[in-house]
């Protein structure tokens, strides 16, 4: 019985994460893609790549911008209206992107 309950819990978590990723992608297309690129690879020289970053790291940074603890004129405006749920969704989207590196 415990195994069935645990499997159900894991499936629900996976489904919730998939929903967060999809919602995060939609939000990122509107709020983030201009600077950070449609796939998290920055299009502007001063914007960092977000693809493949840790969800925890991204969430902490967005919350720091939102609270004013971390200062940036653009990011402060972008992050200010974000809810905790939207931050979780954006973080899930960018952390779900797989990045590969080619050595020279």
Task: Name the predicted role of every residue range.
Residues 29-38, 48-49, 60-63, 88-92:
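C-type cytochrome heme c attachment motif
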Residues 61, 70, 79-104:
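C-terminal capping alpha-helices of c-type cytochrome domains
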Residues 2-8:
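Sec-dependent signal peptide recognition
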Residues 5, 28, 41-43, 71:
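N-terminal alpha-helical segment
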Residues 25, 40-67, 76-80:
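Gly/Gly-Pro-rich "capping" loops immediately C-terminal to redox-active cysteine motifs
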Residues 19-39, 51-53, 102-104:
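Sequence/structural segment immediately N-terminal to covalent heme-attachment motifs in c-type
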Residues 20, 28, 54, 61, ...:
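Stable alpha-helical elements in mature extracytoplasmic
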